């Protein structure tokens, strides 16, 4: 999982990427290609 300052580029890496909020953090998840997971936080 990548930790990024902004998820704009992470969301546009694949069509199946979705943004979710969990426990106050923002994540990009992708069920078909799990290598595209990312978390926002600094």
Swiss-Prot record:
What GO molecular functions are on record for this protein? structural constituent of ribosome
InterPro entries for this protein: Ribosomal_bL36, Ribosomal_bL36_sp, Ribosomal_L36_bact
The keyword Ribonucleoprotein is assigned to this record: yes
Report the Pfam families cross-referenced here.
Answer: Ribosomal_L36
Give the record's GO CC terms: ribonucleoprotein complex; ribosome
Keywords assigned by UniProt, alphabetized? Ribonucleoprotein, Ribosomal protein
Q: Which family does it belong to?
A: Belongs to the bacterial ribosomal protein bL36 family.
Name of the protein in its database record: Large ribosomal subunit protein bL36
Tell me which species this is from: Anaplasma phagocytophilum (strain HZ)
